[in-house]
Amino acid sequence: MRPDGIAGFALTIAAPAKINLALHVVGQRADGHHLLESLVTFAECGDGIGLAAAEADHFTVSGRFAPDLSPSAENTSGNLVLRARDVLRRELASQGRAAGPVHLHLEKNLPVASGIGGGSADAAATLRGLLSLWGASLEPARLGSLALELGADVPMCLDGRPLIARGIGEEITSIPDLPSFAIVLVNPLVEVSTPVVFRLLIRKSNPPLVLPENLRSTAAWLAALASMRNDLEPPARALEPMIEAVSTALEDAGATLVRMSGSGATCFGLFADEKSASLAAETISASQPRWYVRATRTAGKSG
């Protein structure tokens, strides 16, 4: 997203990529929802949501990955941005508050169905942007409930800060001491179905995520991360072999830690510094020009 916002819109809200540094599947509820424990951070890159008051509701899309959105993206039922608008509008209407017509624009910079929370981040950004545009506010707990109606990953995307998510994603604990990492995101531009990955998961109850106390240095955090895992990575690799090629490319480029994010197919590599990350991204892009490759930083504590 351009740093000066999306041209022609009164307001632009960033929708940063969500990175699952670790994702442990620890159980399954009777209703079928899986219980997760995930260490999450957010990247400086992502999608963008433009908002402006309008005479009638309007939705437009641009960006590298706009053509990859399904035809249903312009229908309310298949679009988290429009669903977020409608859920928030109904909530405000129930309180007798105005929520007028709006032009929403999605700048789609992240690959679709890629394991880095693009749709969820877009929905969260839409909720935050519309509250600002409409001059409204909600109690944090109520906003979180509305976000959960849209999807399990939406509540964690509201603040864009490092956290641990538990339950189905709604139990959120802030992790203010997580360092900012130089990171490279790589996706081979193959979509991976989250429901299929979960169905292929053989063991539904795995060891929990354990976060050691007194992690004071980046090195200590990296050691802790190395002991964690993404339980969805083995079934995702079985479903899409290109994930292994992506991981290998990051390892060969010198990443200190490589792991898949979410249900894939995006993998990330953590690097010692931004220069190393940029060089790695250039190397991978040169050998795989059709892949999505992005060097960036994550949210977190500097120094």
From Swiss-Prot:
InterPro entries: GHMP_kinase_C_dom, GHMP_kinase_C_sf, GHMP_kinase_N_dom, IspE, Ribosomal_Su5_D2-typ_SF, Ribsml_uS5_D2-typ_fold_subgr. It catalyses: 4-CDP-2-C-methyl-D-erythritol + ATP = 4-CDP-2-C-methyl-D-erythritol 2-phosphate + ADP + H(+). GO terms for biological process: isopentenyl diphosphate biosynthetic process, methylerythritol 4-phosphate pathway; terpenoid biosynthetic process. Keywords: ATP-binding, Isoprene biosynthesis, Kinase, Nucleotide-binding, Transferase. ATP binds at residues 111-121. PANTHER family: 4-DIPHOSPHOCYTIDYL-2-C-METHYL-D-ERYTHRITOL KINASE, CHLOROPLASTIC. Belongs to the GHMP kinase family. IspE subfamily. NCBIfam families: ispE, PRK14608.1. This is 4-diphosphocytidyl-2-C-methyl-D-erythritol kinase. The lineage of its organism: Bacteria, Pseudomonadati, Pseudomonadota, Alphaproteobacteria, Hyphomicrobiales. The gene is ispE.
